[in-house]
Amino acid sequence: MIRRVKREIRVIGFDDGTFPHKKRGEKVILVGIVMKGGSDVLGAVSRWITIDGLDVTEAIIDSILSSRFRGDLRVILLKGITYAGFNVVDVNRVFRETGLPLIVVVRKRPDFEAIENALRKHFEDWEKRMELIKAGGKIYELIPGKVYYQAIGIDAETAAKIIRATSRNSLIPEALRIAHIVASAVMRGESSKE
């Protein structure tokens, strides 16, 4: 339990690389950036995950539990709940198995109706994926129209404080911003815009 949010809180933020011209079943990189607050990068982890697969949950859990940073981490930051297309994170399982609370940060409020329609159209197991997406719980608005978040294993107020404490050069936590830069550079040869 996080009683007080310190500016130097140790977080790990995950994002995947862009994947133009790749097809379902191919691999994309998932990068986790370990930071002290919003200023110091302490390290990084990476795993390959399957486009539209169901392996991102295991990748996140494994990258944390096998990391030398494991004992220092206090929070997991996710840039959305889906990676590599519709490879959906089971946020409750990640919380149970790592013991770390999660904060899911997004720039646009999710349109669950559009997501469900896309899942129905392309996946036989659409109900399972939709259930995992909704398991993130209530969506909170941090900056009206610009930043939204979900809090798993942590209260919403503390989660908001952590987002603010770890954001420096953008509206989202620095660990997520850097994870995006690194992951997109690995996949494209150059980083892409958020």
From Swiss-Prot:
A Pfam family this chain is assigned to: DUF99
Domain of life: Archaea
Family: Belongs to the UPF0215 family.
Annotated protein name in UniProt: UPF0215 protein PF2042
